[in-house]
Swiss-Prot record:
Alphabetical list of CDD domains matching this protein: Niban-like
Functional summary from the UniProt entry: May play a role in apoptosis suppression.
UniProt region (Disordered), positions on chain: 589-747
PROSITE patterns xrefs: PH_DOMAIN
Domain PH positions: 68-192
Keywords for this protein: Cell junction, Cytoplasm, Lipoprotein, Membrane, Myristate, Phosphoprotein
Species per Swiss-Prot/TrEMBL record: Rattus norvegicus (Rat)
Comp. bias intervals (Basic and acidic residues): 708-722
Residues the record lists as Phosphoserine modifications: 568, 574, 605, 626, 641, 645, 648, 667, 672, 683, 693, 697
Gene Ontology terms describing biological process: gonadotropin secretion; negative regulation of apoptotic process; negative regulation of cell population proliferation; negative regulation of DNA biosynthetic process; negative regulation of DNA-templated transcription; positive regulation of DNA-templated transcription
Chain coiled-coil ranges: none
Cellular compartment(s): Cytoplasm, Cytosol; Cell junction, Adherens junction; Membrane
Protein name: Protein Niban 2
Length: 747
């Protein structure tokens, strides 16, 4: 690898890449500085005017998945340095970074991991044919001939490959199809979460960045959705630079690569990854400098906005009226002829899989609570409630149980419309809908938790508890139906705008864009940081198509075909005291209602071994799902299949009947299997993880020489990939783009 990089990425070429990167970054960051002032003004105006969607009926969890591990188990990873497949103990902590250890013993002994992979921008592939096609397309003229040796050989029929257009690739394989399906669901969850790297609570920096990306690409005549708008700001910015650098670099270096097609492909992957690292480090430095400068200037900008808010609004409305008078006739004709006829078909294509997915979320939630209620009847009531609720609280983050919901979005197609509206891929819409599904599931679960916790304060009997669970379930489902309708309608509107607005801007650009500079004189110089002609122009274009989009969504709600509430149905303060319940401390079901202390003597504390067992049991209860295998097995065979669940009642009426029958029985029936995400096979292991943090949290570097805690490392969202340390050593984990003694940052 070193020879390839030293040959094709010498100092002169690296300097040339750095200069081109510098030019692109400076051009983009001018857009970002412009958009920052506009975004700050919009945020403050929104805060003052108080406009926004209807109040949600469900509660939301302020600290989701605190101290949780999503998944753990063994898998084979291909080592590119020695071209060997090695068994790795792998786990996914609450921040969805895939952490790879040498083995389970290394994890238990607190040895630093081999790798921590941030999967933003990656695709999860399940066949070598898919991978070879993408690799062949990445470097023209290297498609392998039939019968020739491929770039990668997999020892089993069940590979999983993480592919990235610019960064290095990761190769895994499993021994069974069932294990492949499980890990595929887990890795897709990681990609989905890491792609959503810009925090939603970033009301200024986030919108400013995404608007700057859009404006910059439009200045290069690139309209439509962009598939690589994924990850945190530095990752997205690196993708933006590589989008421009990649083709020229490929043209320059492609003919110089030597060897067979598969060898040239391997060399290009190494070169692209090395360039991506260089670009990432450069983008990180420049972005942080500009962001720091803007944050220092923010207080002065806020003072101007507060003082002159009314004048800024008046000035902007005056500018909008002038632009509207100029472009409205052209825009209306364009909407009428090229957009309006296609809105119903686009909406229908979006609504069918999305509504099916949200219905599946409702069904899964209903089934899990129903099974838990039956288990409360069968297994001793409140004594086991803590264990059941601990598992139920993790339902939204259980990749296997949520997979049936996510799969409903896979059939989404915009056949015949993608080329017309320049939609490169539907993946951005699929992932957004899936994130909404997970959020709504967690909101429903958390609301159920909160209401049940309040009910438990009354000291109910087992019979009263079961009736209360059923009553709370019905109450939460009504709230879910309303919130899911609001979320879906908002998603449909946003998706339609995301599809149609770039198309309209591209259509209008030849006749309108050249005329925009003359409107600049209408903006007072003092307000020029908060009002931009280009943004106002886009808002006017948006307004021309918005009424058609709103009308289409409204008509869909009237039909009730997809269980959407009409806009006139607004549940104002239907449960005014509910949100007050969420202000308390998070509920720890294992601590408050667990049965871990029953076995200890009343006269004193448990012995050290018993205390360790109780601690280990509590930690295992906080793992969402596990397929951990024994180290002696050596191969990642499937740990086992979950016990089949008894037929669950399909509706509330049937459940009431079952509950009535069970409560009338004199003795409880034999205990049934717990069906709320219990791991099939577990091995005692440390399960403490770092505190929860938003997606864009920085990496916490370990000081030199300090032992690693029991906590699995977090993948830094300021990193674009993995950290690698040599086995058996305990070096500090730090950021670098070059090989260092025992530590290397991988992407």
């Amino acid at each position: 690898m070193g020879d390839v990089l030293s040959t094709h990425l010498d100092d002169a070429r690296r300097q040339n890449i750095a200069e081109k990167t510098e030019k692109i970054l400076r051009e983009f960051l001018r857009f970002y500085e412009d958009q920052y002032g506009v975004s700050l003004f919009n945020s403050m105006r929104h805060e003052i005017e108080g406009t926004g969607p209807p109040q949600a009926q469900l509660l939301w969890r302020k600290v989701p998945l605190d101290e949780r591990i999503i998944f753990s188990g063994n898998l084979f990873q291909y080592q590119e340095d020695n071209k060997k497949w090695r068994n790795r103990f792998s786990l996914v902590p609450h921040n969805y970074g895939l952490v790879l250890y040498e083995n389970k013993v290394a994890y238990e002994r607190q040895i630093p991991p081999r790798a921590v992979i941030n999967s933003a921008g990656y695709k999860v592939l399940t066949s070598l044919d898919q991978y070879l096609e993408l690799v062949g397309n990445s470097l023209p003229g290297t498609t392998s001939k039939s019968g020739s040796t491929p770039i990668l050989k997999c020892p089993t029929q069940f590979p999983l490959i993480l592919w990235h257009p610019y960064a290095r690739h990761y190769y895994f394989c499993m021994m069974t199809e069932a294990e492949q399906d499980k890990w595929q669901a887990v890795l897709q969850d990681c990609v989905r979460h890491c792609n959503n790297g810009i925090p939603e609570n970033s009301k200024v920096e986030g919108p400013a960045f995404t608007d700057a990306i859009r404006m910059y690409r439009q200045s290069k005549e690139q309209y439509g959705t962009w598939e690589m708008l994924c990850g945190n700001e530095v990752q997205i910015l690196s993708n933006l630079v590589m989008e421009e650098l990649g083709p020229a670099l490929k043209t320059e270096l492609g003919p110089r690569l030597k060897g067979k097609p598969q060898e040239r492909q391997r060399q290009w992957i190494q070169i692209s990854d090395a360039v991506y690292r260089l670009v990432f480090e450069q983008a990180k430095v420049h972005f942080e400098e500009v962001l720091c400068k803007l944050q220092l200037a923010r207080p002065a900008m806020e003072a101007v906005i507060r003082t002159d808010m009314d004048q800024i609004i008046t000035s902007k409305e005056h500018l909008a009226s002038k632009i509207r008078a100029f472009i409205l006739p052209k825009a209306e004709v364009c909407v009428r002829n090229h957009v309006q006829p296609y809105i119903p078909s686009i909406l229908e294509a979006l609504m069918v899989p999305t509504s099916q997915g949200f219905t599946e979320v409702r069904d899964v939630f209903f089934k899990e609570v129903t099974d838990m209620n039956l288990n409360v009847i069968n297994e001793g009531g409140i004594d086991k409630l803590g264990e059941y609720m601990e598992k139920l609280s993790q339902l939204a983050y259980h990749p296997l149980k949520m997979q049936s919901c996510y799969e409903k979005m896979e059939p989404l197609r915009l056949d015949g419309l993608q080329q017309r509206f320049d939609v490169s891929s539907t993946s951005v819409f699929k992932q957004r809908a899936q994130i909404h599904m997970r959020e709504q599931m967690d909101n429903a679960v958390y609301t159920f938790e909160t209401l049940l916790h309040q009910e438990l304060g009354k000291g109910p009997t087992k019979e009263e508890l079961c009736k209360s669970i059923q009553r709370i379930l019905e109450r939460v489902l009504k709230k879910y139906d309303y919130d899911s309708s609001s979320v879906r309608k908002r998603f449909f509107r946003e998706a339609l705008l995301q599809i149609t607005i770039p198309f309209l801007l591209k259509k209008l650009a030849p006749t309108c864009k050249s005329e925009l500079p003359r409107f600049q004189e209408l903006i007072f110089e003092d307000f020029a940081r908060f009002i931009l002609v280009e943004n106002t122009y886009e808002e006017v274009v948006l307004q021309t198509v918005m009424k058609d989009i709103l009308q289409a969504v409204k008509e869909a709600a009237v039909q009730r075909k997809h269980n959407l509430y009409r806009d006139s149905v607004v549940l104002h303060n239907s449960d005014p005291n509910l949100h007050l319940l969420a202000e308390g401390a998070p509920i720890d079901w294992g601590e408050q209602y667990g049965d871990g202390g029953d076995g200890s003597d009343s006269g004193g504390s448990p012995c050290p071994s018993e205390a360790a067992t109780l601690t280990e049991k509590r930690r295992r209860a906080k793992q969402v799902v596990s397929v951990v295998q024994d180290e002696e097995s050596g191969l990642p065979f499937e740990a086992g299949s979950e016990p089949p669940s008894p037929a669950s009642p399909d509706n509330v009426t049937e459940l009431r009947g079952l509950l009535a029958q069970d409560l009338q029985a004199e003795s409880s029936p034999p205990a049934s299997p717990l069906l709320n995400g219990a791991p099939v096979q577990e091995s005692p292991q440390p399960m403490t993880v770092l505190e929860a943090s938003p997606p864009a949290s920085p990496l916490r570097h370990l000081p030199p020489g300090k032992a690693v805690d029991l906590e699995p490392p977090k993948p830094s969202d300021q990193e674009t990939g993995e950290k690698v340390s040599s086995p058996g050593s305990r070096p500090p984990i730090h950021t670098t783009t070059e090989d260092s003694a025992g530590v290397q940052t991988e992407f």
